[in-house]
Amino acid sequence: MPPVSEVDRGPVEESSGGLKRSDCVCPVCLEIFLEPVTLPCMHTFCKPCFLETVDKSNMCCPLCRKRVSTWARLNSRNKTLVNMELWRRIQDAFPSQCERRVQGIDDDEEAVMIPKPRVCQPGELRKEYEDQISKLVEEKRALEEAERRASEEYIQRLLAEEEERLEEERRRREEQQLENDEKLARLLSLELNSGPASESTCNIKPAEATPAKKKPSVGDIEKFLRPVPHRQPSSSDSSPDSSLMANKENILSPPKPLSALSAEDCGKLTVHMLECNGKPSTSSFNPSTSEHTFVFNTPKSSSVKRKSSEIELQSEVDLHSKRPCALLRFDSSSEDSPFLSEVAVHEEALRSRWQQEEEDRRLALRIQKELDRENSVDRRKGSADSYQLRQKNTSVSTTTSPDVEGTKKGSNTTTAKNCTGRRGEEKTEKRLSGTTPGKRPGVKTPVSSTAVSSTVKKGTKQTTLTEMFPNMGS
């Protein structure tokens, strides 16, 4: 058996001009070209096939669907549709086939155009398979690398955003803390400068004042925020100092009005923390007392020299670390004792009044609970306020009058009288039940209705017809 590569299923004709039969076959009719027409898209058809498929239908190439309407109309008018050069070459290469095609004679032998099969070389399939596998692995590796890189970038971006957010929150908290510290320092300075000095603070002028446009140094606010260790009160500490430290939380309490102080007290006021422009004092922070000169524009004197005691501040923690609210201690002169003592007395009075109001409120709540407990009504059976129920039939039968017993004995003798009596009683009861609820206050009630009301007022829950109508028994 010959090898597969040597099998030849049909002849393959090739002319001397270099044209193959496969190149001269129309893709529509699968015959050799007859007056070939070459379109602008370089696809060639027979002229009859072109006229049937292109010219009469949609004016598009059957293979590539390119629009050729303008080209077809122009060449049809000029009669240049047929590619004469290709037609001449086909006639020179295949004269017999062209002659039979022109005469309309079909070819007896059909040329089978099957290419010769080719056997693969040893290892060619394995190499092709390995190349395909390596290509797929490389593509997968590249895809995984791209995904990993994208995930790393995304994680880095998330971490950066989180870090920025935390940094922003920390910066915001620090700014808020600084604002709170600054507000607290201002409140402390206003508390110390308020009261008697409310009118004169704006007129205070230091003797050795710096220029007005001098900017405050950065970080001066820290000296008002340093915590001071608790010390045992000594003889030098006066009672107003201790009262002010005990009531440091009541900073926002209304200050004493200026009208309560005299002009002499205003002149003797000493400024402890800040100057009139709100800037911290430029004096050093040593325990010793330094002398400052201030000008007070009071009604009595225009300029008076006063001594002010320096603020004693001691820090035990780092300035950059977080710390609680600063505790300020200072040595006040004897001239401040009336004002501070009055403030302490006023706060003590307010506290005592609040305690008394709280005790009164608790007492009122306790009394109200006792009253609610006393006013509650017990409706259980057997209690004093229980619901009044109807009495049993046995009690009703025992309370009947002798007239009723005589009537019952007479009724038992004759059946006819008993029936008529019962019917009369039923009619009377129905008439009574129909007329009693609808009676009007202006109409006089009979004696029987008065008897019924009297029996109801006595407290009985059920009565008989003879008690309601005593005239019937007689």
Swiss-Prot record:
It comes from the Eukaryota. Pathway: Protein modification; protein ubiquitination. It catalyses: S-ubiquitinyl-[E2 ubiquitin-conjugating enzyme]-L-cysteine + [acceptor protein]-L-lysine = [E2 ubiquitin-conjugating enzyme]-L-cysteine + N(6)-ubiquitinyl-[acceptor protein]-L-lysine. A motif (LR motif 1) lies at residues 119-137. A zinc finger (RING-type) spans 26-65. Residues 1-20, 192-259, 367-474 are annotated as: Disordered. SUPFAM superfamilies: RING/U-box (SSF57850). A motif (LR motif 2) lies at residues 379-390. It is an enzyme of class 2 (transferase). A motif (MIU motif 2) lies at residues 353-376. Residues 233-243, 443-457 have a biased composition (Low complexity). The keyword ATP-binding does not apply. It is found in: Nucleus. Its EC number is 2.3.2.27. GO terms for molecular function: chromatin binding; histone binding; K63-linked polyubiquitin modification-dependent protein binding; nucleosome binding; ubiquitin binding; ubiquitin-protein transferase activity; zinc ion binding. Pfam families: zf-C3HC4_2. Residues 192-203, 385-402, 409-418 have a biased composition (Polar residues). A motif (MIU motif 1) lies at residues 174-195. A motif (UMI motif) lies at residues 152-160. HAMAP family: RNF168 (MF_03066). E3 ubiquitin-protein ligase required for accumulation of repair proteins to sites of DNA damage. Acts with ube2n/ubc13 to amplify the rnf8-dependent histone ubiquitination. Recruited to sites of DNA damage at double-strand breaks (DSBs) by binding to ubiquitinated histone H2A and ubiquitinates histone H2A and H2AX, leading to amplify the rnf8-dependent H2A ubiquitination and promoting the formation of 'Lys-63'-linked ubiquitin conjugates. This leads to concentrate ubiquitinated histones H2A and H2AX at DNA lesions. This is E3 ubiquitin-protein ligase rnf168.
